[in-house]
Amino acid sequence: MPNLKSIRDRIQSVKNTKKITEAMRLVAAARVRRAQEQVIATRPFADRLAQVLYGLQTRLRFEDVDLPLLKKREVKSVGLLVISGDRGLCGGYNTNVIRRAENRAKELKAEGLDYTFVIVGRKAEQYFRRREQPIDASYTGLEQIPTADEANKIADELLSLFLSEKVDRIELVYTRFVSLVSSRPVIQTLLPLDTQGLEAADDEIFRLTTRGGQFQVERQTVTSQARPLPRDMIFEQDPVQILDSLLPLYLSNQLLRALQESAASELAARMTAMSNASENAGELIKSLSLSYNKARQAAITQELLEVVGGAEALT
């Protein structure tokens, strides 16, 4: 017969765990909202930067512009910037992006190219260090909601690698935020920069809302407002120098957006994982309660049988 006290203790333990997972789900939801607000807040700056870059690019389209950050050279070595999380309890978020980066490294090796990692997040750092992979720099303990200062710091390292010609191309491996239950590890080239297509680039802004007591994400496509600068605009500096100065800022802005997307993906994965854990805890509590009631009923029945048996023995 199951021990009633052990079942009761287990029910209480599962209830306490459910409180923790539910609290973690709500905290993750609050942070997703903060990430959403940050994306919206940085959008005007990103729009204006794209407009100026497109304007300068249009103004200089007939000139022979030789800028280091735009120059494509023969690729012999590739830097892989991998963005993961510092913590677990977020489903397959870390595993998926690490696997994508590892597969890309194998592809580069098969092509006869050297590679090195720049890591963001403790999980990816631990994984690749255990496998003795080349790591040029790592960044851990970043804010839950990425900041521009953090993006600038990482961008400086990437610029140093590229301009010193230690690597000829830098690729970014991060998790693109799709929805609360879906995210996708993707790869894009960061350096050399490609400013083509700025005038037609669309972007998406996500909003976390509630409907019927459930969290959901609404996505809004925003069309870029980039357009040529006025023909009569006079520059105090050489337009080439201005473009050269703005390109690192453009890189930092791209990197900040990738950090924001990755953070939102991690938080959404944690929300989903904790929601599933809470549901499983609820089901386990029901099952344990049923077992407890059956065991209690069996114990009462046994006691009654013993009482009846004792009474019959006395008569």
UniProtKB/Swiss-Prot annotation:
Signal peptide: none
One GO CC term on file: proton-transporting ATP synthase complex
This protein's record includes keyword Protein transport: no
Entry keyword set: ATP synthesis, CF(1), Hydrogen ion transport, Ion transport, Membrane, Thylakoid, Transport
Pfam families tied to this protein: ATP-synt
Location within or outside the cell: Cellular thylakoid membrane
Main location: membrane
InterPro entries according to UniProt: ATP_synth_F1_ATPase_gsu, ATP_synth_F1_gsu, ATP_synth_F1_gsu_CS
MF term (GO), any: ATP binding
Function: Produces ATP from ADP in the presence of a proton gradient across the membrane. The gamma chain is believed to be important in regulating ATPase activity and the flow of protons through the CF(0) complex.
UniProt record similarity statement: Belongs to the ATPase gamma chain family.
Complex and partners: F-type ATPases have 2 components, CF(1) - the catalytic core - and CF(0) - the membrane proton channel. CF(1) has five subunits: alpha(3), beta(3), gamma(1), delta(1), epsilon(1). CF(0) has three main subunits: a, b and c.
Protein name: ATP synthase gamma chain
Gene source species: Nostoc sp. (strain PCC 7120 / SAG 25.82 / UTEX 2576)
Top-level taxonomy: Bacteria, Bacillati, Cyanobacteriota, Cyanophyceae, Nostocales
Gene, per the UniProt record: atpG
